[in-house]
Amino acid sequence: MKQLTTYLPLLFLLLLGACKNAKTGSAAQLSDDALMDTVQRRTFNYFWEGAEPNSGLAPERIHMDGIYPEKDQNVITSGGSGFGIMAILSGIDRNYITREEGLARMEKIVSFLEKADRFHGAYPHWWYGDTGKVKPFGQKDNGGDLVETAFLIQGLLAVHQYYVNGSPQEQALAKRIDTLWRDVDWNFYRQGNQNVLYWHWSPEYGWAMDFPVHGYNECLIMYLLAAASPTHGVPASVYHEGWAQN
């Protein structure tokens, strides 16, 4: 039931298709397992086959005709890549690719992230995948994006747990991921030790975006990771006052 609820929008579309074909009696019957496999495989394919070549990370957009009027075919997204990383783990576990192929891709990703632009440990929303330099998301949004960083870090931590007790090569990768996780300075993004986390910081414009993040919305993971950080953990008051607004 939990799986079915998770993929309810897709199921709704499938049911619409079934209703449309009801007159011909050709409606396809999908079991819960078959539905799950279809969603996982197609999600995996997007992030595996569509990855930006140099970084292994997720492009901000893919134009199926190969035409990019804005010349942005190499622009990659940090938060979307966090979800893509977890999709690749699913692909390994479901034998869509070998464990060795998955590890090679993860090593490419981590090698890129170790060298790519970061801002007090936090990643920007976009990079140029061929250089690792920040691609501004907006005029004053050319630095750290703490929400997108959280989406990326949660994916990396899933990889860490997948490999931490594996082969020596896998354990070495898990250790490198742990360093990236520990480098994120969540406390810095409190802007002067306020009891709230700020979404953006720019080395050029500072706190000009001025976006304190309050609940409740999709940004909860940012507060959870900030509280859990072994190196830059925030006090409970940041969660209670900033997120829950108690």
Q: Residues of each region from the PLM?
A:
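Low-complexity, Ser/Thr/Pro/Gly-enriched N-terminal "stalk/linker" regions
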Residues: 23-76, 120-122, 127, 227
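Bacterial N-terminal signal peptides that target proteins for export
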Residues: 1-8
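Extended ligand-binding clefts on enzyme/binding-domain cores
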Residues: 33-35, 121-149, 165-246
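Well-ordered alpha-helical scaffold segments within catalytic/enzyme domains
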Residues: 27-35, 45-46, 82-97, 112, ...
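Active-site-adjacent structural elements in enzyme catalytic domains
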Residues: 42, 100-115, 139, 145, ...
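Membrane helical hairpin/interfacial module
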Residues: 73-82, 86-142
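Aromatic- and histidine-enriched alpha-helix N-cap/loop-to-helix transition segments
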Residues: 39, 75-86, 144-154, 212-217
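C-terminal motif of bacterial Sec signal peptides marking the signal peptidase cleavage site
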Residues: 15-18
